[in-house]
From Swiss-Prot:
Belongs to the germin family. Glycans are attached at residues 56, 75. Residues 1-24 form the signal peptide. This is Germin-like protein subfamily 3 member 2.
Length: 227
């Protein structure tokens, strides 16, 4: 009996080790911490690097490991959606630790459009409200439900996911990602705001040139600023 128990414990430890190794997204740190010198690149900028120069340890303070920016919502867009991304650029203590966060607030009826993080898995915790949340796997199967306060959902790395507030109050979600530079690509902007050939888009979606033009005006940052 003791031998079986010992075997199970060893197997469990090995499984945990393999899972942790497999899920690791960023390089392991080679020191206790590396508080970066001030930078300006946002956490979802693909140019953001873990190879940032570190402060001298004599300059590091407790405040480098404390972040208060999730207490309040970010600035709401016209569509009723607000985010507060949290990475090494505004929470220095996260640098080299392979993790980042985001607070998302959705007014009733508003959405976080389909998007994905190419370099990270995300775990979303619904702090307040009722939110229809889910993701789509590589077989185009949707896994979605209406989440209640206190529930969590995981969005596997690289899979498209989304949220919509189906409640009567502003919903708040806090997400954790296993990379300090997870990246983000919003599907509407990727398709219609990146400059893909219009003829290709017409054939892919069965839309007219006029319809494609309307969508590009909405999602292309250059064209939207001209109108």
């Amino acid at each position: 009996m003791e031998a079986n128990t010992l075997f199970l414990l060893k197997a469990l430890c090995l499984l945990c080790f393999n899972v942790c190794f497999t899920l690791a997204s960023d390089p392991d740190p080679i020191q206790d911490f590396c508080i970066p010198k001030p930078v300006t690149s946002p956490y979802h900028d693909h140019h953001f690097s873990t190879n940032l120069p570190c402060k001298n340890s004599s300059e590091v303070t407790t405040e480098d490991f404390v972040f208060s920016g999730l207490k309040t919502a970010g600035n709401f867009t016209e569509t009723g959606f607000a985010t507060v991304p949290v990475g090494p650029e505004n929470f220095p203590g996260l640098n080299t630790l392979g993790i980042s966060f985001v607070r998302a607030d959705l007014k009733p009826g508003s959405i976080n459009p389909p998007h994905y993080h190419p370099r990270a898995t995300e775990v979303a915790h619904l702090v307040k409200g009722r939110v229809y949340s889910g993701f789509v796997d590589s077989n185009n199967k949707v896994y979605a439900k209406v989440m209640e306060e206190g529930e969590m959902m995981v969005y596997p790395k690289g899979l498209v996911h989304f949220q919509m507030n189906v409640g009567d109050v502003t919903a708040t979600i806090v997400g954790g990602l296993n990379s300090q530079n997870p990246g983000i690509q919003k599907i509407p902007s990727v398709v219609f705001g990146s400059g893909i050939n219009e003829e290709l888009l017409m054939k892919a979606f069965g839309l007219s040139l006029k319809q494609i033009g309307t969508l590009k005006k909405r999602f292309d940052p250059v064209m939207s600023n001209e109108h």
